[in-house]
Amino acid sequence: MTCLKKTGYIYAIENNFNLHVWIGRTTTRSIDECFQTHARLARSRPLCGFQQYMAVYGPENFSIRKIRTVRYTWTMELDLAEEEYSFLCDKGGSKSGAEGDLWSRMVVNDCPAVEFPSTSEVVKLALEHTVEAQPLVPDRFASLLLDERTLAVGTTIKEKLVNGKVYVSPLVLQWIWGHQCRDNFNHQLYHFFKVVNDHKIPHNYIGYREPLVSEFSEIQAEIDHLPTTELTVKRWLVMDAASFREALMLLPTPRCRLVRRYYLAMIECLRLYGCYIHELTHSELDLETQLEMDLKDLKFS
């Protein structure tokens, strides 16, 4: 199984009044489209801390530029590239080239808890985006309430699922820990496994002869480069989606705080989606009842 390389971009949004900068990444859209989305939401309905910041000072005082093109297989790799730039900006790292003047800049903090409007406001907003009484699909509904960075957490995790299971690879562990524990796989694995054991979270170690191995391209790539002596004793940690999610919710890393933020937000989204569907259904019933009454009035007039 071969995973094709994709192209993503790391960008910086700067302003003309201080040294603050916001680092972001994009996969399918151009950086100009990303900027237009931020500016539009800042003017109308900010969904994240940065858009609120942009709203205070006015989108016209901000500009965007690309700082790196990234070729990646998994979105986690793009997340790590984005995090590297945010980390080095805050720490005053040294780089040369187009992005060199970003270092020692203050990155705008963009990780507050998600704040939802009132239920009635959410329902009204969703109804405004409903066309011909066709209910919004859940993903579209969530995109009205959550910023792209929050939604991207769910997309990134889903990308690693294979038939409801996750291989806890070095890349996954690096994504979880980020710059807190860079390039220290044994440390990452130890603390991950400690959480799994302490909380008795179901997991499984599989060998190279297990049928499940064939479903994970990363494991197959490792097998191709392992000598026979190592291959016979090598084991890979695999978990089902629910167990992996539980482990993420318990780990004390910045990335896992984002994961908790995402899942808690999705629980609230699910509740609000139910309110929206209820209102939409009742509105349709009320409309049908009114039409029936109008037809009766017409018949007897």
Swiss-Prot record:
Disulphide bridges: none
Family, similarity comment: Belongs to the IIV-6 019R family.
Name this polypeptide is given: Putative MSV199 domain-containing protein 093L
Organism, scientific name: Invertebrate iridescent virus 3 (IIV-3)
